[in-house]
Structure formats: C-alpha cells, structure tokens
Swiss-Prot record:
Any one GO CC term of the record: peroxisomal membrane
The protein's name in its UniProt record: Peroxisomal membrane protein PEX17
Top-rank lineage group of the source organism: Eukaryota
Membrane-spanning residues: 127-147, 187-207, 212-232, 258-278, 318-338, 372-392, 475-495, 504-524
Protein's membrane topology: Multi-pass membrane protein
Keywords: Membrane, Peroxisome, Peroxisome biogenesis, Transmembrane, Transmembrane helix
GO annotation, biological process: peroxisome organization
Gene name of the record: PEX17
Entry's localization field: Peroxisome membrane
Function: Involved in peroxisome biosynthesis. Required for the import of a subset of matrix proteins into peroxisomes.
Family annotation (InterPro entries): PEX8-like
Main localization category: membrane
C-alpha cells in the first residue's frame, strides 16, 4: 500500500480542509499550533485533490503546490523532492478510483497539465508533477483490465506529457547551474531517472544526451550517490567500528533516492554514450577510473583495520551495487568501441582505460565468488580492442617488428608493476588474479620478450604453492591457465623449451592436493602436445619429449594402487568416466600421451604401459581397499582400449590393434 494513501488528520471533503491545505502549502499556521509535517501535507494532497469538484479550485491548488515554500524550497532535499513525485503519483492513481461525482478524470488531468505547462517559474519545480503524471499513467496501464473499468490517459496527453517533460528537462540543464544549489541543479536528473523506469527518453522525443550525462554523472558520483568511491569508508568511520551501526548506515544509504535509482541511471547513461563525442567519453572514463581507484584504496584500508569487513553483508551489497552501476556505464563505452570507427590512438586508449578501471574493482567480482555478465562483456570487449593492434601479424607472428610498442603490452607491464605478489591481502590477490586473467589472453599474440620478462615470471610465482593452498587456489589455477595458453603458441618455442623441465617437475606433485584429476590430465596432455614431434619446441630441443614421458612414467610407478581421489579435488559425482583412484588418474595421463610417441617406439611404450596396468591386481593384494584397486584395473583396461581404437594416427592405430591382440606375447626391446 502506498504510504500516502493513509488518511491524514481531518481528511474529509470540506472547503475548510481545502483552505487548511492551501495554508499548509503557503507555510502559514495557526498561532500557537505546531508546524505541520511535510508528510501530512502530502497526505492531504493525495486525499483532497481527487475529490475537488470545481476546476478553478483544482487550478488553484496545483499552482500552490508548485509555488509552495514548504514542498519546493530553494534548498530542497532530494529525498523530499522524490517524496513529492511519489505523492503526486499516488494522487492521480487515487483520482482514477474515485467514484463520487467530481471532475471527470480526463478533465482533471487536462487541468493539472495546463497549470503545470503555464507555470513561468523555475522549470525544476514542474518536473516532480510531470514525473508523477507519467509514472501514474504507467501504473494505471500496467494494472490491466479490472471488473470496474478504470479511466486511462488519453493518447494525445501521453505524448504531450513526454514532450513537456523533455523540453523542461533540457531547459533546466541549459541554464547556468554554477550559482544554483546542488539540489536544484540535480533535481532534473533525478526526475529524469525516475520516469526512465517506464518511459524511453531516447526515441523521437529525446533528452539532451550530453547534458544529461554531464550533470547525471556529477550527481551519481556526488555525496548524494557514490561519493567518488569513498562512501563506505565514511559510513564505517561514522559507525565507530560497530558492524551493526555500519550496517544500518549503509542500508539507509542504499535507500536514498539517487543510490536507489543507480541501476536505472546506469542503463540510461549507457544508451546515451553512443550519442556524444569521443573526447567527452574519454572524460567519463577518466572519472570512472578515479572512482574505482578510490573505492579500491578505501576498501584496502578498511580490510587492514578490520578484516571482518570482508564478510559484512551490507558492505558487500553496497559494493555489488556500485560494481553494477560502473560496469553498465562502461558497457555503453564498450558498445561504442565495437561499433563505431574512430582514431586508432583513442580507440586503443579507451580500451586501456576500461581495463584500468576493471583492474581496480576486480576485488568486488572476486568477493562475489562468481563472474558478472556486464563485467565480463567490458573485460573481453576491451581485450578484443587491444589485441586488434596485432591483427596484421596474426598469421605470422615472426613478422612483428621487435621494437614495435603495443598498448596491450604496455598494460601488461603496468599490471605487473602495480601487483604486490607477496601480499596476503585479498584485494592485492585480486589484482594479481586480474593480471593473470589478462595475461592468459595476451600470451597468444604478444612479443616473445613480453612472455619471457613479464607474463611467465608473474605466472611462475603461483605455479607451485607450498602453503595456504585453498586461499591461493584461484591464483594457482589462473597461473597454470596462463602457462598452458602460452605452451600452445608455436612461436613461443624458445621460451617454452626453457620452461618445460621446470614446469613438468612442478606439475607432477600438484596431484593430488591442488589439481583436480581432470586439471592434472589436461595439464599433462598440453605439455606432451607442446614437446612432441613435429612441434616447434621439439625442433628446439628433442630431448624434452623423452624427459616428459620418463617423468610421467616415474610418477605412475611411485603412485600406490587403490588410493581414492580426494573429494576436494574431484568433479561432480554425476560425471561419468571418473578415474576411481589416484594411480588411475596418473596412468590415464600416460595413456593419453601415447599417441604422441614416434611409431618406431610406439609398441614398446604400449607394452610398458600395459605391464603397469596388468600389475594392478597383484599390487592390489597389499592395497588398503582391494575393491577399489580392482575398479582401477578395469578402468585402465577400458581407457587403454579407448585410446587404441580412438581417433589416433592411422599408422599408430594399425600398430596398436596388432599389439592388442598379441599383447600376451613378449614384446622385445627396451625403452
């Protein structure tokens, strides 16, 4: 129920009440009587206006409302301004329900509209009433058909309302606002955001996009909104360190008019961006960067002073709201980058700046524990723009001029320079995680020097965790994703050849404990694929292939039979073909590696692998879980057959099939 539909004191339909309302609106009061609360005045408007029978009286009251020093003072509070919009909206909805013989609904609306349009004073005073009319029209239309036919807004009036609102809005923003109070300067934007929930202001009757963005962004970043990214720090300081008090203050902040409408503003702003010039968009992006950096720094300080703030529900909710707002606005910039032609320098710089902003607020995404669609869209769109600079060299990376500077690599160096790799603060870990996610995309196209001096060194820092594994797990997984992406690039052969021995030695101990079984198998397969003939790494150092297979074979021999895979590193139990034991996982990695072996030694490797499989039942006698050991044997036999009969080289397939049917015979030779 609307709060303004609660009857005010003495809310009957008398001339006395009408006079009383007018006195209230003018700020007059009976000598000795207490001043009437603004809410009571608004309630009287809701109950009295729909029952007025004389159009002249309605005309009078509307004029009094617009000129009221109580409702629309020069230093009006934005909350009071929003209340007036809500109250007038409720008034019109009530008028549509009033059955007493009064002025007809259409005549009542026409009178209100004419009084508002004729008002010659400041335009900002007209906007709450126009917004109330527009929102009420939406409410009445949205209610749908009822048993009692409700009157609706005439089509012509709908159009006139929208046109009058847009004209008034543009006039308000075109006037010099330097000597006006913050409230009266920003009131038009708040009104615009209010009705944008139900009316498109971007069509045939469109607002002034640039002015809306200019004043609107000032509003949402002001003390009425996000406070340039410092709101949380201020509210926690005011709470004196008490979590409950801080929660109450933040909850109140989230309900303030501007903050409550951030979602709507962000979508309007995102749609407006495509209509303004590039230089102005650049200024918008610069301001967003500053907000993001401020929020990151204040959150760092908060978490240092009180680590429990990481789990403070209201603080996290506020951060999510802020993230959503900033990403939706930047989504408009991303759309513009992907659809409009522009100077390449500005094109690349805007994408660079978008990633700068996302880098600062990635800690919020990390805090959420899941990706956010708008964030992902901006992130990958900006990366696409930066990597487009490599387009002329994609087919042959060897043609990249060694001294050519790329914006994407400048960002890579900047991220490395600002990352605190040794820090245990969650916000610092989030920054490193962002850098690794970016490097995973960049490593496939950039200079070898960037890979060797920036990307791989950063990833190396987290490849082999020795402690705090659960806390570091996202970083470990991201670091390995970077390396695996780099291993797949043929032109990284020299760098990869140097890395492989160390990397193989570091990967093998990660299962079990860090890697899930499928992560381990994937990592081994990627390494084998990188070092096997006829790869560029194999041409660089042919010994690496044998080193990798020998290391894997040793891991197979050293892994006991019948030990279950830890629950912490398994995948969903609904997935089929899950290896039953740790040894089955390691052996599976070896089996999957066999198709890369040279045909001259392929049969020997098949036999050696089969010997280890066939040894399983014997080894199971000493296993703690004999049933699991037998399941391991069955699994490995099946996987061996899948490999042999699967999609492998035809020549290898012929050798493997012949071997399979004579495998009980002795195969002569040594590995």
């Amino acid at each position: 129920m609307n709060k303004y539909l609660v009857p005010p004191p003495q809310a009957n339909r008398t001339v006395t009440n009408l006079d009383l309302l007018i006195n209230n609106l003018r700020g007059s009061s009976t000598p000795g009587a207490a001043e009437v609360d603004t809410r009571d005045i608004l309630q009287r408007i809701v109950f009295i206006l729909p029952t007025i029978k004389n159009p002249l009286n309605l005309d009078l009251v509307i004029k009094e409302i617009i000129n009221s020093p109580r409702l629309l003072p020069p230093l009006i509070d934005l909350h009071d301004y929003q209340q007036l919009t809500d109250a007038f909206r409720a008034t019109i909805k009530r008028k549509a329900l009033v059955t007493d013989p009064t002025i007809s609904f259409e005549a009542w609306l026409e009178t209100c509209f004419q009084v508002i349009t004729r008002f010659a004073g400041p335009g900002w005073k007209k906007l709450p009433l126009l917004a109330g009319l527009i929102l009420a029209d939406y409410d009445i239309s949205a209610d749908g058909p009822t048993l009692e036919r409700k009157p609706g807004f005439p089509s012509k009036l709908k159009h006139l309302l929208k046109r009058e609102f847009v004209t008034t809005f543009d006039q308000c923003l075109s006037i010099d606002t330097r000597n006006r109070s913050d409230a009266t300067k920003w009131v038009p934007v708040l009104a615009c955001i209010s009705i944008a929930q139900v009316y498109s202001l971007l069509g045939d009757v469109a607002i002034n996009y640039r002015r809306f963005l200019q004043v609107g962004l000032d509003l949402i970043f002001s003390n009425y909104g996000l406070e340039m990214g410092t709101a949380l720090a201020r509210l926690h300081a005011e709470s004196g360190g008490d979590a409950t008090t801080a929660g109450g203050l933040i909850g109140k902040k989230l309900k303030e008019p501007v903050v409550a409408l951030l979602n709507t503003f962000a979508h309007i702003a995102s749609s407006c961006i495509v209509h303004v010039d590039i230089d102005y968009i650049d200024r918008i992006q610069n301001k967003i960067i500053l907000v993001c950096e401020n929020q990151a720094e204040t959150w760092r300080i908060l978490t240092i002073e009180s680590p429990t703030v990481m789990h403070h529900q209201e603080s996290v909710q506020y951060l999510k709201w802020e993230l959503f707002t900033l990403c939706i606005i930047m989504q408009g910039i991303a759309n513009m980058l992907l659809t409009q032609k522009m100077n390449q320098f500005m094109y690349l710089q805007l994408a660079y700046k978008q990633l700068q902003a996302l880098h600062s607020i990635y800690f919020i995404v990390d805090q959420m524990g899941s990706q956010f669609a708008a964030y992902d869209y901006v992130f990958f769109s900006a990366i696409d723009v930066l990597l487009s600079e490599y387009a002329p060299y994609i087919k042959n990376r060897g043609t990249i001029p060694p001294n050519k500077e790329f914006v994407a690599e400048r960002l890579a160096a900047n991220l490395a320079g600002t990352s605190n790799v040794g820090s245990h603060l969650p916000i610092d870990r989030s920054r490193v995680l962002f850098a690794l996610n970016y490097y995973e995309q960049l490593v496939t196209v950039c200079h070898d020097s960037c890979v060797e001096t920036i990307i791989y060194p950063m990833a190396r820092s987290f490849l082999y965790p020795t402690s705090d594994i659960q806390q570091l797990k996202p970083l470990v997984e991201a670091a390995h994703s970077v390396i695996l992406a780099g291993l797949a690039v043929p032109t990284n052969a020299v760098v990869n050849a140097k890395l492989i021995p160390e990397y193989m030695g570091g990967v093998l101990p990660l299962f079990p404990g860090v890697f899930s079984w499928n992560q381990f198998v994937l990592a081994i397969q990627s390494i084998v694929n990188t070092v096997s003939p006829p790869s560029e790494v194999f041409k660089t150092n042919q010994k690496l292939f044998r080193l990798v297979l020998d290391s894997l074979m040793k891991k197979c021999r050293d892994t006991p039979v019948g030990i279950p895979v830890p629950h912490s590193v398994t995948v969903s139990q609904e997935q089929e073909d899950i290896p039953p034991t740790q040894r089955a996982v390691v052996m599976l990695a070896l089996i999957n590696s066999l198709p890369y072996v040279d045909i001259r030694s392929f049969e020997l490797w098949l036999q050696e692998t089969w010997n280890m499989i066939e040894a399983t039942p014997m080894l199971a006698e000493n296993a703690p879980n004999k049933e699991l050991a037998h399941a391991e044997h069955e699994f490995l036999v099946l996987e061996m057959w899948k490999m042999i009969s699967g999609n492998i080289d035809q020549r290898l397939n012929d050798v493997a099939i012949r071997w399979w049917y004579k495998k009980n015979a002795r195969v002569h030779g040594t590995l």
